[in-house]
């Protein structure tokens, strides 16, 4: 695991000397693209839900057309005139996990998904693809974005959520930018949130390879307020009004804590430079969740808070898989045994040598 995340860090956080290539194609701001992934186990589709612009770009400015990981889905941005790939990224989604549940056999649902892309200078074609566990295409769509489109909503220029930096090493373009959001904290509880966010930050940087590369990161705590204190626990019939509507019992797994309100997460972050997201839930219940290039969400007041936030960040930041089995995990049987998983910390031994042989 350490070797894999170190590789990702080196790929993302290199010197900005190659950034001039970025300026050939992109402005120093963000194109936020909202999609709805919908369907059921029999068929899936992708719908464009909205476009908006954010005032800064906090992602990578090098290796723009390279994928460090395959993920369960991919986005390719091409220059519309030449067809040249100018940016690509990968991700996983809660929707794809849901497709493995029994419910997906009989019910059609839609899930919000939001992605941050560098803002193009010229018209671009964006292609987004969802893959199944065998790496076959489940759903795909293409659409053209004109950067001067007057209907691209401008966000992040006002009404910015209160925030403060826990770790600020350099400007956003020279660091990996992590935002920690409050979930289930009222306005009166924000001091507690800042203390919890500081614990989360310190817990992550207590571990390698983050510890050695701490100076490559900025971490900001964002005080997104909730009406109610705490988060929803369906098995106890407790339902709260919170900033992001998070709840336990996702897919009927008691400790799986997620939110489907992805657009609300990104709205709360508009105007703050960010790339990776951690959400802290104000609860003593045990649980959490982490989705690659989407978010980490974890309980903040359970005794296992520190190791859990590190574990879940491994999912969302590093694309790592769980290395253990537990009952009612919908992902347990999703890995075909004749295909090597893209996650770097597990193996079916189909291509074991490429991953770990040099470590033995």
Identify the meaning behind each predicted range.
Residues 4-13:
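Sec-dependent N-terminal signal peptides
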Residues 15-19:
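Sec/Tat signal peptide C-region and signal peptidase I cleavage site
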Residues 25-151:
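Beta-strand-enriched, solvent-exposed domains that form extended recognition/catalytic surfaces
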Residues 150-211, 221-231, 250:
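Fold-level signature of zinc-dependent metallopeptidase catalytic domains
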Residues 190-193, 288-312:
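Short pre-active-site segment immediately N-terminal to the catalytic Zn-binding motif
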Residues 216-292:
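Active-site-proximal segments of metallohydrolase catalytic domains
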Residues 313-329:
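Catalytic Zn2+-binding segment of zinc metalloproteases
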């Amino acid at each position: 695991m350490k070797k894999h995340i170190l590789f990702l860090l080196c790929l993302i956080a290199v010197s900005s000397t190659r950034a001039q290539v970025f300026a050939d194609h992109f402005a120093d701001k963000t194109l936020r693209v909202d999609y709805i992934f919908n369907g059921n186990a029999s068929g899936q589709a992708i719908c464009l839900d909205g476009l908006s612009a954010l005032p800064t770009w906090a992602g990578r400015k090098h290796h723009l057309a390279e994928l460090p990981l395959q993920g369960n889905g991919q986005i390719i941005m091409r220059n519309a005139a030449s067809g040249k790939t100018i940016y690509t990224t990968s991700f996983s989604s809660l929707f794809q996990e849901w497709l493995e549940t029994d419910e997906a056999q009989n019910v059609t649902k839609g899930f919000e998904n939001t992605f941050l892309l560098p803002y193009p200078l010229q018209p671009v074609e964006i292609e987004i693809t969802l893959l199944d566990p065998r790496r076959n295409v489940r759903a795909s769509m293409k659409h053209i974005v004109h950067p001067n489109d007057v209907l691209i909503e401008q966000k992040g220029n006002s009404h910015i959520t209160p925030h403060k930096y826990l770790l600020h090493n350099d400007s956003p373009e020279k660091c990996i930018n992590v935002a920690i959001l409050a979930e289930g904290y009222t306005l009166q509880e924000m001091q507690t949130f800042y203390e919890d966010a500081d614990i989360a930050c310190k817990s992550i940087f207590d571990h390698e390879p983050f510890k050695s590369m701490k100076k490559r990161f900025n971490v900001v705590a964002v005080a997104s307020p909730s009406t109610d204190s705490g988060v929803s626990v369906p098995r106890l019939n407790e339902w709260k009004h919170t900033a992001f509507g998070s709840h336990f019992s996702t897919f009927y797994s008691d400790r799986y804590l997620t939110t489907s309100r992805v657009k609300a997460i990104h709205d709360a972050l508009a105007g703050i430079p960010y790339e990776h997201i951690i959400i802290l839930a104000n609860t003593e219940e045990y649980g959490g969740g982490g989705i690659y290039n989407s978010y980490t969400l974890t309980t903040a007041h359970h005794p296992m808070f520190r190791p859990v936030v590190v574990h879940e960040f491994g999912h969302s930041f590093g694309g790592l898989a769980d290395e253990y089995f537990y009952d009612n995990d919908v992902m347990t049987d999703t890995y075909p045994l004749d295909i090597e998983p893209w996650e770097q910390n597990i193996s079916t031994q189909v291509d074991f040598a490429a991953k770990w042989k040099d470590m033995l």
